[in-house]
């Protein structure tokens, strides 16, 4: 972009505003402002420049369209159902390893570690820390139910990663990830004294925190030996790595954190710049990390200028039989006087001096047997791996340096090109059954011809032995009756990631068909004749009459040892006639076919065992599912029977209480009747008698009253009769008086 001089450059207000917006957006997001805002600022800037020619012209290049991004790389989700256990705040929690990350059972955490906190508090902290909890699959839920971790009525279960569980527990149990700073006036009084053995450390987990480590205080795994330089509080190492005061993260995806791996997270402070001081403090830190490391998870870094003994031994075993022969492109083996087979010497230009002194240790002797190019390879790999840029330092969430992977990719250029097919495998894969095939790729201009593994023991070097004490070299490959295979070696694609054992199995199966064609006498005779007529053939060695005896003397041995012994005796005796060579070739082919038959039988047995194991696994899974279903049904039936039993027991208790109450009432009534029946009857009868007496008295009184009334009426009648008689006597005569008196008397009687 072309601009005017810096002193006279004045950015346009629109451009300045865009830059400010970009600066603010880039601090809180991964992208920045949208593309149209920058394009709008550019167009407005051009328009303003066209209107005002006095301002300096700033030519902005046209914005290139964004490159087409490749499609997403789809991978099947990891639905692991292998249950394991982990320790969280002293509690054992069940978990599943999904994608390399432990996912813990959330209900188990809530009921054990966080049982003193409410769901509202936990949800608020999860929102603050941007913690997301996933749901377990049906298989995982079934396993948790079968193991008794969840009840069978649980519809689902949440899973939380080990990293988020550490953050959540630290925020709730220890006052949050970002505790407040202590007052500065008290910081000087509680600050630890800086001694020769104490030094500053830091970590970059969930933000950055610096502390002062005092190794003397690290007396047990939970001892508080690190003081935070901000709050001056003491923490044990596994709590210090989750302690922080600065929110340096913005929606960071945390993965793979485990406070038990604090030895990888705590680093030496960058304030120490002196080489000697840094080395001394680094050694103290390593010694402190090695204390109480019962699982031996922490391993001290090896110096960059040399390899550890374990790495040297592993490299020695890996390249023990793999050396490059520029003449024929195949690996060669030699038999030492002690009976051990070792690779032959490399070319003279790369040959190293070998000290055969008996005073050397076995490790040094084995190290001297390595070729010069192998040593240069190891040294170059050490340099490439050990050379790490200071800016690419290890961190809690950046434990690998980009330089390591890049140098490891360049490591293959130092090695001879290996044949990327099934003819190369580890010498440990079938060391009890077959000979190790360590064939290397020949130069590009030569035709690739694969020989049987039995022919790889023959050296193409024609150098004579230097002394009688040294093992004599094998003859040139052209002298040996090695069977050339007409089929070229099949190279496998580079993306083939199968194991070495499976690769060797495929090669053996393909090689069996070629060996069957080699077993015919016509082919062996023609091939041996071709070998006899080849140029550069040396004078044949006189045949030994003891060849047949030597060829069959080791018939009792089997496998690799018998084959190697047979070849050694045959080559030591020498072959001079065509018949002897053909006979030797027939023996080799017969032995190889027999060995292949044994290998095929072993592979078939292994395949059948694998199938049976898979069948048993499926059957076991099916039985487990059936048992789980039966257990669930049985539990449901037990729950139903328990509910019915409880209901019946409740009804029986209620009826028992009611009957008991009625019985008590009846008993009270019966007791009262027995004690009060006579008195009640007596009182009843007395009352009746009194009533009758009262009634009798009333009747007597009424009778007396009636008698008195009757007496009064009689007296009144008598008086009336007198009065009437007197009146009759006075008024009427005597006759009439008689008749009237009679009538009156009759009326009175009536």
UniProtKB/Swiss-Prot annotation:
GO terms for biological process: negative regulation of BMP signaling pathway; negative regulation of transcription by RNA polymerase II; negative regulation of transforming growth factor beta receptor signaling pathway. The keyword Nucleus applies. The gene is SKI. Pfam families: c-SKI_SMAD_bind, Ski_Sno_DHD. Residues 558-732 form a coiled coil. Keywords: Coiled coil, Nucleus, Proto-oncogene, Repeat. Residues 458-469 have a biased composition (Polar residues). One of its GO terms (molecular function) is protein domain specific binding. It is found in: Nucleus. Residues 493-504 have a biased composition (Acidic residues). It comes from Gallus gallus (Chicken). Residues 371-384, 479-492, 512-528, 735-750 have a biased composition (Low complexity). Its main location: nucleus. Residues 329-386, 447-542, 727-750 are annotated as: Disordered. Belongs to the SKI family. This is Ski oncogene. May play a role in terminal differentiation of skeletal muscle cells but not in the determination of cells to the myogenic lineage. May function in TGF-beta signaling. The keyword Nucleus applies.
